[in-house]
Amino acid sequence: MSDTPYYTDQVLRAAACYWEEKDADNVKLEKAELQARIEAYILANNTCALATGTGDYVRCTPIEYSYHDGCFWMFSEGGKKFVGLAKNPQVCLAIYDTYEGFGKLHGLQVMGRAELVEPFSERYNAHAAFQKIPLSALQKLS
């Protein structure tokens, strides 16, 4: 075994750029077509892995979502994801298919800023109505 670590900064930078370089010569979809395909994929699913974190603490939580008005919406009664959300609104979520072989996996990663909506506010209640979730059911989670 070598005294020199394999994972040098150069090796890690090359790994981080792998897909950009591999896909550089591929034909790209028009922006409107790409957006339509992305939204269709998002709407065809309802569960994601939501990553939150702060400092050395990270958490990745499977959670149900809905998508409308260009935003992901999630209801949660609590959990460790709020440790990160309390100090850092930056999040990442991943939606993906069951693995059926190399080159056949479909998925999507989204990075953005989480916004906590106050329970039973007008926006909260509107989303509950959109999801057809009775407020009485959500009150039991509080």
Where do the language-model regions lie?
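Short, basic/aromatic recognition patches
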Residues: 26-47
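Alpha-helix boundary recognition
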Residues: 42-43, 83-87
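Short beta-strand segments
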Residues: 45-78, 93-97
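Active-site-adjacent structural patch at catalytic or cofactor/ligand-binding sites
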Residues: 77, 87-98, 106-115
